[in-house]
Amino acid sequence: MTTTGTTAFNMEFTELAEEAWERAGREMRTGYDLRTARRSLNLMTIEWANRGINMWTIETGTITLTQGLATYALPTDTIDLLDHVIRTQANNAATQADLSITRISVSTYATIPNKMVQGRPIQVWIQRLSGETNPTTAVLDGAITATATTITLSSVVGLAGSGFIRLGTEDIYYGYISGSVLGGVFRGQNNTTAAAQTDGTAVFVPQLPAVTVWPTPDGSQQYQFVYYRMRRIQDAGAGIQTADMNFRFLPCVVAGLAYYIAMKVPELQGRLDMLKKVYDEQYALAAQEDREKATLRLVPRIAFIGGGS
C-alpha cells in the first residue's frame, strides 16, 4: 500500500474549536461557543508570548538611520528584539560590515551626559510599548506643509517630552517641546508619508515600540540598524483560517484551548486538573522542540590580581 505523499495537515479555527470543546467534555453547539473559544485562543497566545520565545514569530528587519535622529519606530506587533547590529556599507560585497551594538537599560541611557553627540551608534535602548494609539485633546494650531520642521499645537498637555504623534495617517517624531511648539521634528516616520495637514487636525499619540541609539547617527556614512524581532502571534480569525503557529504546536493549542474553555463552563470544571496536566505536558513537548540547536562553547576569562585582565 502507498502513503499519501502529502505533509500539509493543518486545522482551521473551527476544527480547533470543535476538537477543544470535545476534549473539554461536550460538543460545540452554538455560535457563542465558537466566539468564546476564539477569545480564549487569543488570550492563550498572549500567554505563550509571556512564556518565552516562539521560534516561528522571529523575523528580521532593517531600519536605515538618519543623521541627527536617534529614535526609530519598530513594527507595532513587536514584542522584543532578540539580536541587533549596525551595518555599514550595506549591499557592498567587499566592504559590508555588521558591527556590534550593545543593548542598554533606560537608567543607563538616562545617565548619558550628551545624548545629541553624533557618531556611529554603539548602544541601543529598546522601548517595548504596546502599539496602541491614544487620543489627546490637542489639535493643530495652524496648517502645516509636508516639509514643516516645527508643529504648533493647541495644547501639549499629556504629551511626552519627546516621542511620536500621529496626524491623519502620518507618524511624526519630535525631539523636544518649547511652549506649545514641537521641535526637532522628523516627518513620515514608521513607513508613513509626510503630508500637508490642515488647521484643527486631531492629534493622536501612538505607543510605538521603538529603538533609541547612541551616539545619534552622523553623516560620515550610511548606517542600517539590522534586528531580529519576536512579533505577536496573529489573532484567531474566522472559521476558515488556520492558526498562526508551527504545526508542532497543534496538539498544544487544542489541549490548551480545551483547558481554557473548561475553566469557563461550570459543569466541565471536574475535568480541569486532567486538562491542565495534558496542556502542560503538550506545551513542554512543543517548546522543547521549538528551539535552536547550535553548539554552545563557554570559555573562562582568566585574570590575575594586579596583572590586568
Give the location of each predicted region.
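Glycine-enriched, solvent-exposed interface loops adjoining structured elements
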Residues: 1-135, 166, 204-309
